[in-house]
Regions:
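Intrinsically disordered, low-complexity non-transmembrane regions of multi-pass membrane transporters
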Residues: 1-29, 85-86, 255-306
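Hydrophobic core segments of alpha-helical transmembrane domains in multi-pass membrane transport
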Residues: 25-40, 64-79, 96-110, 135-143, ...
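Hydrophobic transmembrane alpha-helices that form the pore/transport pathway of multi-pass ion
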Residues: 1, 146-213, 371-380
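C-terminal transmembrane helix pair
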Residues: 26-31, 200-224, 228, 239-246, ...
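Transmembrane helical segments that form the transport core of multi-pass membrane transport proteins
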Residues: 290-377
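Interfacial loop-to-helix junctions that mark the boundaries of transmembrane helices
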Residues: 16-20, 49-64, 86-92, 120-129, ...
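Transmembrane alpha-helix boundary signature
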Residues: 77-85, 104-119, 148
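Hydrophobic alpha-helical transmembrane segments of multi-pass integral membrane proteins
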Residues: 134-147, 164-187, 341-373
Length: 440
């Protein structure tokens, strides 16, 4: 009789384990399909996230415009309610009000009142699309990526190699996939969310947001079409150089000096195993899992996104306005180009003036840099410039305002130092590549 009871308990336990695994596999697969697998709909090969975004952009553009205005108005009211004798708060209200005027002028087709360069307006609109549509939609589905075992499974299989090469945990690999396959807007939110929930350390967060946010598959595809280079070959080169850059930068100042502590001490347990990886990952997931339902998690993620966008959108609009002014003052751009040219010339690279101009434009926007590329350059020159565009730039128009407005502990000085370190490493690699190419 006792043997029968034990047998029944064993069968029930194995049955429960099976259904637990199936649930994790199904939910993780849904997340992978939604975020990473391109599907062809109406002759457009995109992920489900972007198909939904484009549909809403075409069918509900007026609602989106109203939503953007609503975000800024909410942000202004929030500052007004918290107003005190602090002059910084008053300046923020003025800047956000000015951003609201700029946004309305863009919506009514009067953007030339504030912007001289049409490319900057196009880039700003594209970024607003990612912020106002893609990110909120992605946030609704993001629990499938972060809350149902995929983080633990990814960490189980990639933790050892990520630790050895980049000094980060294996869960960063999943975050990297969001950066490269979705966009850096969603990627930076995933980094923020992992850090806020006590799943990433301070140093890991800094390394992730500064080292893994530079590469984008969609940008690589556009770049290769522009310079007529085979995408897969160029992408392999990007990955190799990215690994070299990140390997070095994660081991030197300032990222090396970042604290290993968490934003707060949660009960989250990391996955670090050599055997039985899938079983260990599932066990860790059930130790870490939230008791919230899927709908509650989705709404919680959306609420966080809305709260972030309230301050982020007006800040980005104002930054684009300042960039527009700087970009159209010849003296400033020439001075910056001359300084960059001195640096590039020291490495004896060809067409140093062109490379310097591309590097500086890339600080503002990769699209500006791509548009400025000449079509009739030599293959090696295209290759070098393409590497600079693809990997050199930290997106200052997005990352700096996001980081400074969030709980992520990075100073502007640290961001600029990391950007300069990457520039030096890439320039040195291009120098070696060019001299090897010439020797052949």
């Amino acid at each position: 009789m006792e043997k029968t009871k034990k047998s029944c308990r064993s069968n029930n336990s194995s049955s429960n384990d099976f259904f637990k695994k199936v649930k994790i596999y199904i939910f993780s697969l849904i997340g992978i399909i939604i975020f990473f697998i391109p599907i062809k709909i109406n002759n457009e090969l995109e992920t489900i996230i972007y198909h939904i975004s484009y549909f809403l952009e075409n069918e509900a553009s007026s609602i989106i415009e109203i939503s953007l205005i609503f975000f800024i108005v909410l942000s202004i009211f929030k500052n007004i309610l918290n107003i005190d004798k602090n002059n910084v708060n008053k300046i923020e209200i003025c800047c956000k009000s000015f951003s609201l005027v700029i946004l309305v002028s863009i919506f009514v087709g009067k953007e030339d009142l504030f912007f001289i360069n049409d490319n900057l307006v196009f880039i700003l609109k594209d970024l607003m699309l990612d912020l106002s549509i893609t990110l909120p939609i992605a946030s609704l589905f993001m629990p499938f990526l972060l809350e149902y075992g995929l983080v633990e499974i990814t960490e189980a299989y990639t933790n050892r190699i990520m630790k050895k090469i980049f000094k980060v945990s294996g869960k960063v690999f999943l975050n990297f996939l969001v950066y490269i396959l979705v966009n850096n807007v969603c990627g930076v939110f995933v980094t923020y969310k992992l850090y806020k929930d006590g799943k990433l350390r301070r140093r890991e967060t800094a390394i992730t947001i500064l080292n893994f946010s530079v590469l984008s598959l969609s940008l690589t595809d556009d770049l290769c079409n522009k310079i007529n280079i085979i995408t897969i070959k160029f992408f392999i080169m990007e990955i190799i150089i990215l690994i070299i850059c990140n390997f070095i930068i994660s081991r030197i100042y300032p990222l090396k000096k970042k604290k290993q502590s968490y934003y707060f001490k949660s009960n989250h347990k990391n996955v670090n195993c050599k055997r039985n990886k899938i079983n260990t990952a599932i066990k860790r997931y059930y130790e870490n899992k939230s008791n919230k339902k899927l709908l509650s998690l989705s709404l919680s993620y959306l609420n966080e996104v809305i709260y972030i966008l309230m301050d982020l959108i007006p800040t980005i609009i104002f930054i684009f306005f300042i960039v527009n002014i700087i970009y159209n003052i010849p003296f400033i751009m020439e001075s910056i180009n001359n300084l960059t040219n001195i640096f590039v010339s020291a490495f004896n690279l060809p067409n140093s003036n062109l490379i310097s101009n591309i590097i500086n434009l890339n600080l503002f926007s990769s699209i500006l840099a791509i548009e400025s590329m000449p079509q009739n350059s030599y293959y090696i020159i295209k290759l070098i410039i393409g590497i600079f565009i693809a990997l050199q730039c930290i997106n200052f128009c997005l990352l700096i305002p996001f980081i400074k407005g969030s709980i992520i502990e990075l100073t502007i000085g640290e961001i600029l130092i990391v950007a300069f370190e990457r520039l030096c490493i890439i320039t040195f690699i291009c120098f070696i590549t060019y001299n090897f190419y010439c020797a052949i």
